[in-house]
Design a protein with these regions (language model features):
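Active-site neighborhood of HAD-like aspartate-dependent phosphohydrolases
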Residues: 1-23
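An amphipathic alpha-helix signature
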Residues: 4-8, 43, 47, 105
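Short helix-capping segments at alpha-helix termini
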Residues: 13-17, 55-57, 116-119, 143
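A metal-dependent, Asp-based hydrolase signature
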Residues: 17-72
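Substrate-recognition element of Asp-dependent hydrolases with the DxDx(T/V) motif
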Residues: 60-79, 84-115, 125-128
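Asp-based, Mg2+/Mn2+-dependent phosphohydrolase catalytic module
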Residues: 85, 89, 105-206
Length: 206
């Protein structure tokens, strides 16, 4: 949200903050098929949105400031959830641990390296999207039956519900910020997945 707020500040002479937020979100969603998920696509969407809202009058200086916002996102430290390393240490020798993420390959590789957690994982996969077919294809490639797979994630839409649909299990760990595109209206609780409040709660179940 911090980047979106700064973006709105850059365009405050053209529109209200609420309108800017709405238009940026629309532009992001429209561009997902072109750019995929990731910071670079977000940067391009910021520029496109700024041009649209300003009727192509936005200055090169302002566009430069938007690029700087994107670079700040790329270089910012990785925020680890409390207990994540404790959980990984406990599970590493018991299970085959896999990172499944979506977005720009370079961005995600950089994040994993910064996190210092790569040693705990047996496999890393960066998907173009997180839908049922993406997961089914990957599990088939890795020779893992859905019934033998447990997903742990913070997004119901991307990390939990698609896995439940293909017969896998999932644990939902809510995060304090969720992108609007990842929100699910009226999710059905206990429909093949469980929700816990902290990562370390996982150790009670696996």
């Amino acid at each position: 949200r911090d980047t979106e707020n700064k973006f709105a500040d850059l365009l405050e002479k053209y529109e209200t903050k609420n309108k800017i937020d709405q238009e940026l979100f629309k532009t992001e969603i429209k561009n997902l098929d072109l750019y995929g998920y990731g910071i670079k696509g977000f940067m391009l969407s910021m520029i496109e949105c700024a041009l649209d809202l300003s009727n192509n009058e936005v200055s090169s200086k302002t566009i430069g400031a938007m690029l700087d916002l994107g670079k700040e996102m790329i270089t910012q430290p990785v925020e680890l959830l409390n207990g994540v390393e404790e959980v990984l240490k406990s599970l590493k020798d018991k299970y085959r641990l896999i990172v499944l993420t979506k977005g720009d390959l370079l961005d995600q590789e950089r994040k994993l390296e910064k996190s210092g957690l790569s040693e705990y994982f047996h496999h890393v996969e960066v998907l173009s999207d997180k839908k049922e077919k993406n997961y089914s294809d990957l599990l088939e490639h890795l020779q893992i039956l859905p019934s033998e797979f447990l997903m742990i994630g913070n997004s119901l839409k991307s990390d939990v519900l698609p896995l439940v649909e293909i017969g896998a299990r999932a644990i939902h760990v809510p995060f304090h910020t969720t992108w609007e595109h990842e929100k699910v209206k009226d999710p059905i609780e206990n429909n093949g997945y469980m929700t816990i409040s902290t990562l370390t709660d996982i150790l009670e179940y696996v």
